[in-house]
Regions:
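Alpha-helix boundary/capping residues
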Residues: 38, 55, 77, 210, ...
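Alpha-helix N-cap/helix-start and coil->helix boundary motif
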Residues: 45, 136-137, 227, 253
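Conserved catalytic-core segment of NTP-binding enzymes
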Residues: 142, 159-177, 191-297
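Short beta-strand segments
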Residues: 102-103, 185, 221, 275
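Acidic active-site catalytic centers that drive phospho-/nucleotidyl reactions
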Residues: 42, 133, 185, 223, ...
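Primarily NTPase-proximal linker/entry elements flanking Walker-type ATP/GTP-binding cores
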Residues: 4-132, 138-184
Length: 299
C-alpha cells in the first residue's frame, strides 16, 4: 500500500472541510474549518495554534487570500515539524547492524519486525530475525511464520526464557552467518512497570556485549491511534532503553494521522518508519514532504 493510500481516512476528513475551487477565497469560516480539521486529525493544539496564526497573518498582513496558497504555507509548516535529519535508519561500520524493536502490547512490533526484514531483503541485505518476546508463545510462532514466508533466518527463544540471552544468541548467529542486520522483536511491556523496563535495559546492555556498540537503533513502535498515551510511552521507553527513533503503525486504520506531528514535535525523536497496511510491503520510510502531501494533496 502506498503512503497516499494508507492515509486515506485521515485525508478524507481533511479534504471534506478544506478544498474547493483553485481560486476559492479564504474566509473566516474556512479558517475555522481548517483549524477544526487539523484538531480532528489529532494534530496537537500546540502545533495547530502557530500554524493557524501563520495562516491568518498571510491573509491579514500579506493579502494572500486564495485557499491553495494558504494551504501551501500550512504544508510547509507541517513539513518543518517532521524535520529532515536522522530519518534514515542508522548504519553500522561493524556487521551486523543491530535493531531492537520495543513498545507496549498490541503496537505491532512483531509485524513491524517482519516488514522491516522484507524491506531490507528487497534492498539486497541479509537480515536475521530474533524472536525475543518470551512472554507470548504466539509472538514467537508468529515471527517464525513470517520468517518462513519471507525466507529469512530466525533465532527464537522458548516461552519464559531470558530475552537478553536470546538477543545475545541472535546477534552471535548474525555474526556467524554474515548477516547485515539483526532485527530483534522484544516483548510488549507497560512503560509504567519498573521491573519490566529494567529487564528491557538489560536487553540493551547485553546486546552491547554481543557486538560492541550495539544496538545501533532502538525503535519504539507506537500505535498511530494511541494519542497522548504515546507520549508517555515514549518517555518511559526512552529512559529505560535509549530510544533512537519511532515507528508509527496502523495509520491506515485511523482518521487521526496527525498524531505523527504530535509525537515528532513533543518527543524530539525522528519518525523513521510508517506502517500503512497489513501486508509485508506496507512499511514505508518517513518522507516528510510525501507524508504532508498525502494528507493535504495539491488539488
Amino acid at each position: 500500500m502506498t503512503l497516499f493510500a494508507g492515509l486515506a481516512r485521515t485525508r478524507s476528513g481533511l479534504l471534506a472541510r478544506l478544498f474547493g475551487s483553485r481560486d476559492q477565497k479564504v474566509t473566516p469560516q474556512w479558517l475555522g474549518a481548517l483549524e477544526e480539521a487539523l484538531l480532528r486529525a489529532d494534530v496537537a493544539v500546540t502545533l495547530v495554534d502557530p500554524v493557524m496564526a501563520q495562516a491568518r497573518d498571510l491573509v491579514l498582513l500579506e493579502g494572500i487570500d486564495t485557499v491553495p496558497k494558504v494551504l501551501d504555507a500550512v504544508r510547509g509548516a507541517l513539513v518543518r515539524v517532521l524535520g529532515a535529519e536522522d530519518l534514515a535508519l542508522r548504519t553500522s561500520t561493524v556487521r551486523p547492524r543491530v535493531i531492537l524493536l520495543v513498545g507496549v502490547n498490541g503496537s505491532g512490533k512483531t509485524t513491524t519486525a517482519a516488514k522491516l526484514a522484507k524491506r531490507l531483503k528487497d534492498a539486497g541485505e541479509s537480515p536475521l530475525l530474533v524472536a525475543a518476546d518470551t512472554f507470548r508463545a504466539a509472538a514467537i510462532e508468529q515471527l517464525q511464520a513470517w520468517a518462513a514466508r519471507l525466507d529469512v533466518p530466525v533465532v527464537a527463544g522458548k516461552p519464559d526464557g531470558d530475552p537478553a540471552a536470546i538477543v545475545f544468541d541472535g546477534i552471535a548467529a548474525g555474526i556467524a552467518r554474515g548477516s547485515t542486520t539483526v532485527i530483534a522483536d522484544t516483548a510488549g511491556r507497560l512503560h509504567t512497570k519498573a521491573h519490566l523496563m529494567d529487564e528491557l535495559g538489560k536487553v540493551v546492555r547485553v546486546a552491547g556485549r554481543a557486538r560492541a556498540g550495539a544496538p545501533d537503533e532502538v525503535l519504539l513502535v507506537l500505535d498511530g491511534t494511541a494519542g497522548q498515551n504515546a507520549i508517555e510511552q515514549a518517555r518511559g521507553f526512552t529512559a529505560a532503553a535509549g530510544v533512537t527513533g519511532l515507528v508509527i503503525t496502523k495509520l491506515d486504520g485511523t482518521a487521526k494521522g496527525g498524531a505523527v506531528f504530535r509525537v515528532a514535535s513533543e518527543l524530539h525523536l525522528p519518525v523513521k518508519l510508517l506502517g500503512v497496511g497489513e501486508t509485508a510491503a506496507d512499511l514505508v520510510p518517513m518522507d516528510p514532504l510525501a507524508f504532508v502531501d498525502a494528507l493535504l494533496p495539491r488539488s
